[in-house]
């Protein structure tokens, strides 16, 4: 029998990339190649070896390799991009754009060269614009270039709702639309706890507070850490997307997808409900929006477009 093991490459061996690599290996979803720049090759190899040495204790079989050589990523089923400079306190997302766009373009050229059939999942911020940059640089079909923010934003929303109601997070579902920023749109109407609409369980002013905290969720953690940004929940969110693709689960997940007329928008990457499976983006789900939700989404789209203007 030939080698049927799946292969996932994670570009960027910082906190998020390394945690993602570990979670993917731990769940035995695939063998993992962790990649960073040549100056960081030894620390990257060290992290990979450290994870590998956890495998007998955790009881997982997966190869984990650290490298700065993209040849090692050849034939990846999925490539996850977490590389880029991090956002520091007081730094706007737009400050990140030019630097991270250059990184996206160079990384994407390597992905196209060594894994031309891969599906790319982008996490690097500002993620809507960075996913667009990767899509344009790769020449891949839109189904094979998707961004992660909605799974994370929705996870934050679900966490805060579960805390508010003192319920299991497993029983809370929700959806967050739009860009990954202060203008994201948590769709409360489509959010439930144990199948019961949230609006019947939580007073409006508490829901509004939860929505606001969700919007500021990334910033809250940046401020608490004082140095760096969230990585456990982002890595868990990436891993959920990777699992949905590798196992062809056809999960309904909010992802950053390329719109061609859906929701009335054209030629833009935006967070929308999607079906994620073996081909990557299987389908975009169009929800009926109220005038208020539509206005909020328009505002979110304008924010994304303003960031995209900075792209070369």
Curated annotation (Swiss-Prot):
EC number: 1.1.1.37
CDD domains attached to this UniProt entry: LDH-like_MDH
Active site: 180
Binding site for substrate: 87, 93, 125, 156
Residue positions, PTM Phosphoserine: 149
Molecular-function GO term, any one: L-malate dehydrogenase (NAD+) activity
GO cellular component: cytoplasm
Protein name: Malate dehydrogenase
High-level lineage: Bacteria, Bacillati, Bacillota, Bacilli, Bacillales
Name of encoding gene: mdh
């Amino acid at each position: 029998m030939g080698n049927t093991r799946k292969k996932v490459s994670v570009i960027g061996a910082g906190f998020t990339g390394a945690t993602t690599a570990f979670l993917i290996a731990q769940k035995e979803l695939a063998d993992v190649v962790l990649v960073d720049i040549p100056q960081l090759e030894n620390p990257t190899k060290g992290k990979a070896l450290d994870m590998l040495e956890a495998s007998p204790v955790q009881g997982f079989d997966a190869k984990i390799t650290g490298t700065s050589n993209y040849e090692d990523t050849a034939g990846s089923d999925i490539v996850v991009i977490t590389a880029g400079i991090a956002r520091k306190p007081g730094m706007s997302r737009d400050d990140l754009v030019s630097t991270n766009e250059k990184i996206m373009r160079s990384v994407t050229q390597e992905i196209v060269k060594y894994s031309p059939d891969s599906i790319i999942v982008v996490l690097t911020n500002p993620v809507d614009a960075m996913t667009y940059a990767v899509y344009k640089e790769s020449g891949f079909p839109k189904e094979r270039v998707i961004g992660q923010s909605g799974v994370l934003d929705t996870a934050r929303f679900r966490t805060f709702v579960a805390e508010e109601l003192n319920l299991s997070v497993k029983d809370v579902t929700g959806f967050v639309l739009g860009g990954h920023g202060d203008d994201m749109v948590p769709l409360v109407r489509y959010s439930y706890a144990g199948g019961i609409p949230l609006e019947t369980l939580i007073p409006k002013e508490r829901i509004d507070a939860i929505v606001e905290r969700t919007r500021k969720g990334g910033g809250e953690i940046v401020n608490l850490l004082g140095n760096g940004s969230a990585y456990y929940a982002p890595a868990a969110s990436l891993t959920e997307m990777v699992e949905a693709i590798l196992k062809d689960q056809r999960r309904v997940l909010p992802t950053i997808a390329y719109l061609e007329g859906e929701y009335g928008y054209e030629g833009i990457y935006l967070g929308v409900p999607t079906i994620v499976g073996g081909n990557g983006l299987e389908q975009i789900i169009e929800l009926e929006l109220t005038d208020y939700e539509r206005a909020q989404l328009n505002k979110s789209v304008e924010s994304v477009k303003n960031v995209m203007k900075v792209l070369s």
